[in-house]
Amino acid sequence: LVSVSPAFNGNYFVE
């Protein structure tokens, strides 16, 4: 599922 925490350059990361 997709995480609600921003990762990398403000993009959402799939976890």
From Swiss-Prot:
Main location: secreted
Post-translational modification: N-glycosylated.
Name of the protein this chain belongs to: Factor X-activator 1 heavy chain
Required co-factors: Zn(2+)
Record note on cofactor: Binds 1 zinc ion per subunit.
GO-annotated cellular components: extracellular region
Subunit annotation: Heterotrimer; disulfide-linked. The heterotrimer consists of 1 heavy chain and 2 light chains (lectins): LC1 (AC P0C8J2) and LC2 (AC P0C8J3).
All copies of domain Peptidase M12B, residue ranges: 11-15
EC id: 3.4.24.-
A molecular-function term among this protein's GO annotations: metal ion binding
Cell compartments where the protein resides: Secreted
One BP annotation, GO: proteolysis
Function: Catalytic subunit of blood coagulation factor X-activating enzyme. Activates coagulation factor X (F10) in a calcium-dependent manner by cleaving at the '234-Arg-|-Ile-235' site. Weakly hydrolyzes insulin B chain (by cleaving at the '27-Asn-|-Gln-28' and '44-Gly-|-Glu-45' sites), fibrinogen and some components of the extracellular matrix in vitro.
Source organism (scientific name): Vipera ammodytes ammodytes (Western sand viper)
Assigned protein family: Belongs to the venom metalloproteinase (M12B) family. P-III subfamily. P-IIId sub-subfamily.
Keywords noted in UniProt: Blood coagulation cascade activating toxin, Calcium, Disulfide bond, Glycoprotein, Hemostasis impairing toxin, Hydrolase, Metal-binding, Metalloprotease, Protease, Secreted, Toxin, Zinc, Zymogen
Protein's UniProt keywords contain Secreted: yes
Something else known: Negative results: does not activate prothrombin or plasminogen.
Tissue distribution: Expressed by the venom gland.
